[in-house]
Design a protein with these regions (language model features):
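Ribonuclease/tRNase effector modules and their secretory precursors
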Residues: 1-113
Length: 113
């Protein structure tokens, strides 16, 4: 069935609905993972809404979303989100998209030019 515990859902620039669960958010901001993301949740949403994506070659269900920001801490300049695409069955027995964030982090990406 469709997962519960959704924190929020956004639509990417390609028309896909993507959600983040409370469990995944807790994982992302845990001290051993990416606690620096905690105050940048809106940036994560923006990266999903406006960022470019790339399909992972070894797992075609996995996409990497990336979007630049000029006011991130230290020397990083992008927010990256990993999203798994799939399907689920809703309460009416219909197939529905099930696309969710697995993790997110900052990254420095050299810009061309």
């Amino acid at each position: 069935m469709v997962s519960s515990g959704k924190r929020w859902t956004v639509q990417d620039r390609y028309g896909n609905s993507i959600y983040l669960t409370q469990e995944r958010w807790a994982h992302i901001i845990a001290g051993t993972n990416h606690p620096e993301m905690e105050i940048h949740e809106e940036y994560l949403k923006m990266a999903l809404k406006k960022g470019r994506r790339r399909q992972e070659p070894l797992n075609p269900r996995k996409y990497r979303y990336c979007h630049p920001f000029d006011d991130l801490p230290d020397d990083v300049n992008h927010v990256v989100a990993i999203v798994m695409f799939g399907f689920d069955i809703d309460e009416r027995g219909q197939t529905v998209p099930n696309n969710f964030v697995t993790t997110a982090f900052f990254k420095h990406i050299w810009l061309k030019g």
